[in-house]
Design a protein with these regions (language model features):
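Beta-propeller-forming repeat regions
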Residues: 1-224
Length: 224
């Protein structure tokens, strides 16, 4: 928001390492603002100040998944905070995805979804509070997100058009618990405190590529 242009450059250093550099363009050339290894990254205004923050997903020195949030201070991009995320970077690099949108409270958020062993989706919900990145769904006891269910090729999205992103939570159908061809999906929204609420339920015929929005009261009565 300062009228200057920045460029993010990512490149593969080796088979197992990618690097990311942020440059600002000036009259006499470019100047490096930040350098990090990464698996995925996202750029978004997370605190409504008109400036977009940079979030970098990478593995720390122990191999644990980490999210680094870079903030603008006096024209310089600086590391503001780092937090744990649920997934390993090996998992995130495959079918993982970052979705940028808002919570029920209109708070900007990053939904980081990992697919473990191609069978289970785990989603972290990251927000910026007082300049500190926060994972709303990370359990202090287990160290992983409580938002986890069977993966059926669905990712967080605004499923009902209310302007809020919902997280898909797979619920096995009675009599067909092992099948992935058809699923009931509960779509979960969050507020800025991390409080979850079900927005709606859908029936998804995954292999056929269609879904049905379930009327209120139908969800518990659907069988395979």
């Amino acid at each position: 928001g300062d009228g200057k242009m920045e460029i993010i450059v990512g490149w593969r250093v080796s088979m197992e390492l990618q690097a990311l550099t942020v440059y600002t363009l000036e009259k006499d050339g470019s100047r490096e603002l930040a350098l990090s290894d990464y698996v995925k990254y996202a750029v978004a205004d997370l605190d409504g100040d008109g400036q977009r923050e940079l979030t970098v997903l990478r593995a720390d020195e122990t191999g644990a998944g980490t999210a680094d949030c870079y903030l603008w201070k006096n024209g310089t991009l600086t590391l503001g905070s780092s937090i744990r995320v649920s997934m390993t970077m090996a998992e995130l690099s495959q079918q993982g995805r970052i979705t940028l949108d808002v919570l029920r409270s209109s708070t900007p958020a990053q939904f980081v979804t990992d697919v473990a062993d191609s069978t289970r989706a785990i989603t972290d919900v990251l927000v910026l509070r007082g300049g500190e990145l926060t994972n709303l769904v990370l359990s202090a006891m287990t160290g992983v997100s409580g938002e986890s269910s069977r993966f059926c090729t669905l990712y967080p999205t605004d499923i009902n058009g209310d302007g809020v992103t919902e997280v898909p939570r797979t619920v096995p159908l009675s009599g067909d618990e092992e099948s992935t061809a058809s699923q009931r999906i509960d779509w979960i929204s969050y507020d800025a405190s991390g409080l979850a609420a079900k927005a709606l339920s859908t029936y998804h015929a995954v292999e056929d590529g269609w879904y049905l929005r379930l009327p209120e009261g139908w969800a518990e009565n659907i069988q395979a």
